[in-house]
Amino acid sequence: MTAQPTDRTTPLLLQGQEYVFRAPIAALDFQERVHRLDLVDPGDGEPEPCVLVLARSADMEMNDLSIALAEFGVRMARIDIDRCLDVSLTVYPDAPLIELDRWVLRPLLVWRRHFELAALPVDPGTLYGAYVADQWRSVADWITNRADWAQVNSLATGRQPDRMTQLTDAAMFGLRTPRTVVTTRPARHRPGGGACVVKTSGRHLVEPSSGVQHGLFPRPLDPRNGSGAPEPAPVLVQQYLHSDYELRVFVVGEQLIGYRVDKLDPAQLWVDPDAVEVRAVEVPPALGTTLLALTRFWRLDVAAFDLLMTDDVPVFLEVNINCDWRWFERRSAEPSGTDAAPVSLAVATWVAQRFAQLRQA
């Protein structure tokens, strides 16, 4: 019988977490829709070079990218994890070709992001659900690791740097990091000797059923719970550091795009986004050099770094590979009334240029 939490055993990061996001499931990809409606030239029957994206339907960054790549004349095809149960797909092991619906495609560049098995609209506790999830896991891993085509964020398709590896590597490259411990007994630890926060060792959003995401946001460690029971799963206990503001740095190829983020607590970005102030800033040159070096070390092409700025000293928190940028662009542009989208433009340009390089190879 599966154990269920009681009031006493509810994990710290599930206590008082009221943020729930319901991800819409709909075909919003521009290129997919115009191809289904036969609004484009069907071509001569030869395999069409393309960018293949494995995502989910609510990935608005990829919806925007589809439009931008169409303007560049680049074909983008897509498999969404939450809409894949009825997809017509054939992937050939002996040729770099796929048949997606009624199109024969030659992927040159593959980008996998937000393609989480938890978003599959099946019950993993049933035989059918376990079967479907296992098949898609195997095939998606194979597609994103094949040598027949290039990948965006090569390391992310294999061994993605976990939170602790990120902290270790960042310190190795000279960045300051908060003192951290991984434990099932958070009440027993005070890394740094003072106030601490408890963080998830995994994702910030957990999806117990397809399309329903619950927040797992950092929370202060209550010193009054010194004799607390063990957690059912390890968490991060991290030294609390006072900061002047947070810095989000998007890395796109060799380009750096920075945003200053002023918020009252870590969860505010999700639970009260209208109260968060965001503005574009220049990335300090020395910090930028270090972040680019880390990006190359991790073999990343598009990623976002989160840092605290404490007395003008950057403190590394994490790198986000499945990073979302539209909210930062929109929020920073609101005061001026502009529609500036520097990250979106940088990503679309980088993908189009990489596609052109691969096509000429």
Predicted segments with their positions:
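C-terminal active-site "lid" helix and adjoining low-complexity regulatory extension at the edge
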Residues: 3-12, 16-18, 282, 296-297, ...
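A short glycine-rich, hydrophobically flanked beta-strand micro-motif that places a catalytic Asp/Glu
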Residues: 247, 300-311
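Phosphate-binding site of ATP-dependent enzymes
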Residues: 69, 191-292
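Conserved N-proximal alpha/beta basic substrate-recognition cap immediately N-terminal to
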Residues: 11-28, 56-72, 77-177
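Short hydrophobic beta-strand segments
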Residues: 44-57, 198
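Short acidic-glycine loop/turn motifs at beta-strand connectors
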Residues: 73, 93-94, 251-255, 310-312
